[in-house]
Amino acid sequence: MEKEKVSLADAKEHGLTETEFVEIQKILGRIPNSTELGIFSAMWSEHCSYKNSILKLKTLPTKSDKLLAGAGEENAGAMDIGDGLAVVFKIESHNHPTAVEPYQGAATGVGGIMRDIFTMGARPITSLNSLRFGDPKEPRNKYLLTRAVKGIGDYGNSLGIAVGGGELFLHPTFTKNPLVNAMTVGIAKHDEMASASTKGKVGNKVYIVGATTGRDGIHGASFASKDLTKESEEKRSAVQVGDPFMEKLLMEASLEAIQKKLLVGIQDMGAAGISCATSEMSAKGKTGMDVDLDKVPLREADMNAYEIMLSESQERMLVIPEVGKEGELVSIFHKWGLNAVEIGTVTADGILRIRKNGTLKAEIPAESLVLGGGAPRYVREEKRPTYLDEVVKFDPNKIPDLKPDTVPQTLNSLLSSLNISSRRPLYEQYDTEVGLVKVVEPGEDGGLVRIPGTKKGIAVATDCNSRYTYLNPYEGAQIAVCESARNVAATGAEPYGVTNNLNFGNPYIPENYYVFSECVRGLGDACRFLGLPVTGGNVSFYNESPEGPVFPTPTIGMVGVIDDVAKGLRTYPRTKEDVKYALVGNFQPTISASEYLYRSQGLDTGAIPNISLEKEKQTMDALIECRKNGLLTSAKDLSLGGLLVALAKIVIAGKKGVEVNLNELQTKVPRLDALCFGETGASFIVSFLPNDETKVRESFTSKGLSVYTLGSSSAKASLSVKGDGFHWEWTTKSLEVEFESGLKSYFE
């Protein structure tokens, strides 16, 4: 055994506390050496162990009779969608790497989440991304945004996976801490799914497959578990470098090996590299491993055991073939031009042994390293931030109401604003057509993709209003769940399951931990009420700079299922017949906490829109029921920018005119700014054929929901809005020009 010992100072340098260093000595019965310290520091980092979040995450609802792989059981969540098929999905962050090296940081985030999906035997069919950056008027923010988007596009396009949707929110709070959350959805056959476990197969050989191992990404896991500082920007060696063409080969080879049933288990090498893959597979299978690092194919000469174990070089897998199938496995990977090298053996005693140059470099119980095993678990001190009691005192009635003649320009300004304008400059860089699975155009509320070989479809969405969760963490998180579910329901699909990416500040600061805890509580309560299992996800703490934490952002990734994609809904009606429009649900708009308030007054304050989980569920149930009965021709969720922005988006997307009369709504909402631009929950604009109006009304009113007549389609290419004391009209072209102008200049 390597004799070199390490000190408490070394442990602290690796991000471990004194208590944790003492615990490691108890586990080993001795002081660890440098290789062992490196392994523990990576595996016990926040990024790998979830040590400050796991006890909170265990309060989330995870049960469903459709669940095939739940939270923490495998690399991603999996749910049964019938016909022997499963939808496999997960979301993960790559925030810190993107802040330092945006192109590679964002690209490798896409690569990592793709591997989580295809290691389970699922072929990825679509990806999404949820992005947060500072105001691109500042050169550094523009650089981070444009380079990250290019990294996402280049990697995904090279893999041949269509982008099905996503979101972008720009705000000064994210200036030094961008958030890049990547989600991938795949489809697998039940009998061709793989596991990340040794399954107790003692004596089986362990192989490393894919790319070579280099020095890139060393300390990546611990790097993602610290606040960002000026020094962080110089830690580019902690950012991995991706090769999407290598990943494409690795995906095809892995899926072929899984389909031919050659494997006992397969695990992606992501955070903490070989350290994580060997320990997690061993612990899950209640075994150990004996690994010889001299056999690992290296990209760079003279790498020591510490570097090899902690390298996060991309496009690598650890696989355990069935006995007697080793030759066939190697042949498949060689056929695809990839390494496939035996590096060890599964052992019975539960110990992870690492050797190099004939010397034992590490000897650690595998269980002691992993989440759910010996990795530490904490609940931190909580303290309610004082600002939460201040922001609710804001009185929107003290803001002067809009005059009718200022509304047209206000709509134009909002349509061209950073958070509402067209995302075309982003999705033009993404391949949205590859694979022939996309059903709806980019820019819809939710993405809808066809499951190859079937009539079924998967609806996908990512959502979170970071301003809401900043102003009210508990209810803001509930709204994030409901908004994501509404976007899936707007396609006509039934919300099915949730994956989450929780982006917060330093958990050791009590105010930050309170906000995190409240968001988790809100997320759990909303999912329980809506009957949605949380299948897994990711926690990213330390999104904080010397100026403070980012707005808390619990990003919700939602999947839904529709029985026939041909019957899916769009934002706009596709029929050539005349249609009528109505506003349905629980319309209670407020300018508090709204995008309108921020753009017009520069304020992030006030009570967020009222949330009623009962009304949300009733509204979505009625909408889906109407879709199933063929009563609707379109559906558009109300969100940022309120009613007029939603109407403008309908006109822009459908390139058809709409005539609206707001007289009925004016009696309910007398303030013009709230009526036109206030934000609300549980509300959709739906369209239908005139003959179906009675049935549509009954579907919603029978559940105690409101139905307000808005107007009808028009032969004129314009949006016409009348009411008591006003008549506004915008041509479709003028709306489109404003909508397309917001982000365009930053990407030219």
From Swiss-Prot:
Q: Does the keyword Kinase apply?
A: no
Q: What does this protein do?
A: Part of the phosphoribosylformylglycinamidine synthase complex involved in the purines biosynthetic pathway. Catalyzes the ATP-dependent conversion of formylglycinamide ribonucleotide (FGAR) and glutamine to yield formylglycinamidine ribonucleotide (FGAM) and glutamate. The FGAM synthase complex is composed of three subunits. PurQ produces an ammonia molecule by converting glutamine to glutamate. PurL transfers the ammonia molecule to FGAR to form FGAM in an ATP-dependent manner.
One cellular component term from this protein's GO annotations in UniProt: cytoplasm
The gene behind this protein is: purL
Binding residues annotated for Mg(2+) 2, in chain numbering:
116, 268
Q: Which residues bind substrate?
A: 93-96, 115, 240, 312-314, 540
Any one GO biological process: 'de novo' IMP biosynthetic process
Q: Where is the active site?
A: 47, 94 (proton acceptor)
- State what protein this is by name: Phosphoribosylformylglycinamidine synthase subunit PurL
